[in-house]
Amino acid sequence: MEFNVVNLSGTAVSYNLSHVGMTESVSTSDPTHVAETGQLLDGGIKAEKVGGNGSLNGSKVTVDANGTLKVKVTYTLTNKDKSLIDSLFPYGMYVEGFIKLTAENSEEIDLNVPFLAFFGDWTQAPMFDKTYYEAAVLDGAAKWQ
């Protein structure tokens, strides 16, 4: 994904890039049901400068005074992450998270850019996932009162 980091101040600002990636987890009592809590992933990011005013050195982003820096970040799942998702969700599952820009100067604010993707075969995924609490009702074993 590509995004702009905009500096409206009269001095250069620097941020350290990091990330957090996650997917759904499954119920511990029945692994066929989504637990609606996050499962952290080990994937990594690769960042590159696309254009603009500033620099990108490793994970450090610096935006010149009154400048805009365009950055491209690619999030890549590890083989372990892919195996986990494949084992829990045969049709695939969402992968989501944040690209975090932590300001080096404590007077600046930290920034977060959300991302959302899908790993698997989108055309094979069911329209709805049953949660643990809905399973009995949807399977006809219980009735609404």
Predicted features, each with a name:
Residues M1-F3, L88-F98, K130-Y132:
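Short, solvent-exposed loop/turn segments enriched in Ser/Thr/Gly
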Residues M1-F3, Y15, V71-V73, V95-G97, ...:
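Hydrophobic residues positioned within well-ordered beta-strands of beta-sheet architectures
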Residues M1-T11, S25-S29, T37, E104-Q145:
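Long, low-complexity ectodomains and other extracytoplasmic segments of secretory-pathway proteins
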Residues E2-V5, G58-V61, L84-L88, K100-A103:
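Generic recognition of flexible, low-complexity loop/linker segments
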Residues V6, G10, N66, L88, ...:
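Active-site-proximal structural scaffolding
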Residues L8-I85:
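Surface-exposed binding patches on compact interaction domains or structured appendages
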Residues L56, G92-Y94, A125:
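Short, surface-exposed loop/turn motifs at beta-strand boundaries within globular domains
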Residues T76-T78, K100-S106:
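Beta-strand-rich extracellular modules
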